[in-house]
């Protein structure tokens, strides 16, 4: 992506600024939402939930090879970099505890409709997840 260091886990794909034009190639609907900030740098309106949804689709495709991701309207849209950060720190804890069991099996209670932790954990670390939620809209 672009230069500009963020303070995320060193293994994170999200330690640099987004290349929005490149991401918009993966999700063309995102392109019409690209704007310039006062410094003339491409960005998006992060307060617009539809734009964040489109950005997430682009990030999941670009970094995690996920070709399809959908979310019911009115559901929370997780910020992917922060969720990936959490997964990387979980991996550090497992490594520090010298967990040798393979494969790693994780129970995600309250996974939500996005399934974001299972998506990132299985993509980056090849972990297995059982994801549960009590909200029928999240499960459908």
Question: Language-model segments: which ranges?
Answer:
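Catalytic cores of large soluble enzymes that bind and process phosphate-bearing ligands
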Residues: 47, 78, 82, 134
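N-terminal auxiliary segments of SAM/dcSAM-dependent transferases
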Residues: 1-76
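Residue-identity detector for glycine
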Residues: 4, 40, 82, 110-112, ...
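SAM-dependent Rossmann-like transferase core, predominantly class I methyltransferases
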Residues: 54, 58-105, 117-118
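Conserved SAM/SAH cofactor-binding pocket of Class I
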Residues: 93-140
């Amino acid at each position: 992506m672009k230069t500009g260091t963020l303070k995320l886990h060193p293994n994170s794909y999200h330690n640099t600024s987004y290349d929005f034009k490149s991401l918009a190639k993966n999700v063309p609907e995102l392109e019409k939402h690209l704007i310039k900030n006062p410094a003339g740098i491409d960005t998006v309106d992060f307060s617009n939930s539809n734009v964040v949804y489109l950005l997430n689709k682009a990030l999941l495709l670009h970094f995690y090879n996920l070709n399809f991701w959908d979310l019911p309207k009115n559901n929370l849209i997780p910020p992917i970099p922060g969720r990936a950060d959490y997964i990387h720190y979980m991996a550090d804890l497992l490594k520090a505890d010298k967990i040798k069991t393979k494969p790693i099996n994780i129970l995600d209670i309250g996974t939500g409709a996005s399934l974001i932790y299972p998506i990132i954990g299985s993509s980056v670390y090849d972990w297995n997840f059982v994801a549960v939620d009590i909200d029928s809209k999240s499960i459908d």
